[in-house]
Amino acid sequence: MTTQIPRGPLQGVKVIDLTTVMLGPFCTQILGEMGADVIKIETPEGDVNRWTGAARSPGMSTGQLIKGRNKKSIIFNLKVPEARAPFEKLIETADVFVHNIRPRAAARLRIDYDTISKLRPDIIYASATGFGEDGPYADKPAYDDLIQAASGIASLYGRVTGSPKYAPSVMADKTTGLFLSNYIVMALFPVSYTHLTLPTIYSV
């Protein structure tokens, strides 16, 4: 007799993951650990995490093994027209769509909320940006060290070290990724919102 082990509370939830580096992949890693069916979209070159950290096999670094676990990978180059139809079919069957692309680039790729919600009106759209979707900083890059500096964390850390320094961890990305995963889970309840925007600057 075989006993089927439950996959977790998010079993049956399909997540389309168009994220990269740390923040987004950490968020969707948590969703996968909760049992969600996470489909990770990668470019033909592969996600940057495939080349981050030690690796015994090319493209299978420690970064990929950690943040890519409990996920299925598919290659789409959304800059070419041929990828659009299969991408839209995926969206039409999804419960959650997550990305961490700046607003202007997201609009160019036609993955903004207005476009995605037309394909699946009840989809939970989670956009993790550095400084929000509007305002003077909306399209500025938001790597972890920039957010640590802009939020004052580097200055606070300097009170201990004697001069401003970055916390020795990708603190902003991990904190925001954790918050975003929690917000997505809350949004899966019918009474919650379906359009989530989480600027990293407010999470640290």
Question: Residues of each region from the PLM?
Answer:
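N-terminal helix-loop segment corresponding to the beta1-alpha1 unit
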Residues: M1-P190, H195
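Single conserved hydrophobic/aromatic residue that forms the stacking wall/gate
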Residues: H195-V204
